[in-house]
Swiss-Prot record:
Protein name: Uncharacterized protein MTBMA_c00490
Organism: Methanothermobacter marburgensis (strain ATCC BAA-927 / DSM 2133 / JCM 14651 / NBRC 100331 / OCM 82 / Marburg) (Methanobacterium thermoautotrophicum)
GO biological process: proteolysis
Domain of life of the organism encoding this protein: Archaea
GO cellular component: membrane
Keywords: Hydrolase, Protease, Thiol protease
Start and end residues of each Peptidase C39 domain: 18-137
Pfam family for this entry, one: Peptidase_C39
Transmembrane parts of this sequence: none
A GO MF term: ATP binding
Amino acid sequence: MEVFDMKSFLGDEVIVRQSSGYSCGPAALATVLRNLGVHCSEAELAELAGTDESGTTMYGLILAATSKGVSARGVRMEISDLRRNHIAFVRYGDTAHYTVVLSVDDRNITLADPAMGRIRIRRDIFSKIFTGNVLVVEREED
């Protein structure tokens, strides 16, 4: 008898959910930092990043990340260059949103989304909302 393995189905990553309609950036950054072993909260990162009711700038997220001892940089990239723990900036209509990449394959993108949790979206759909702007956060090498 095969036992259902919930961990392999859901994954072992932490997903920090956003607490407001404008805190997706700090929540996405908290997701990445916690998965890198850095203790932090969405609220702490929102304060460090200067988040307000209009949201969070990528520069603010970079400042928050570096204050937690990791390197962070904003870059432009294609979907094929996205990797695990990259924070992608997407736009649908007038709504801008940060989401964390878990995996990319030929057909789908799996995301740790601050608003919706773990989701899978077809690559062709994602290509319509992906702006090409990505925050890359990495542990600094000693």
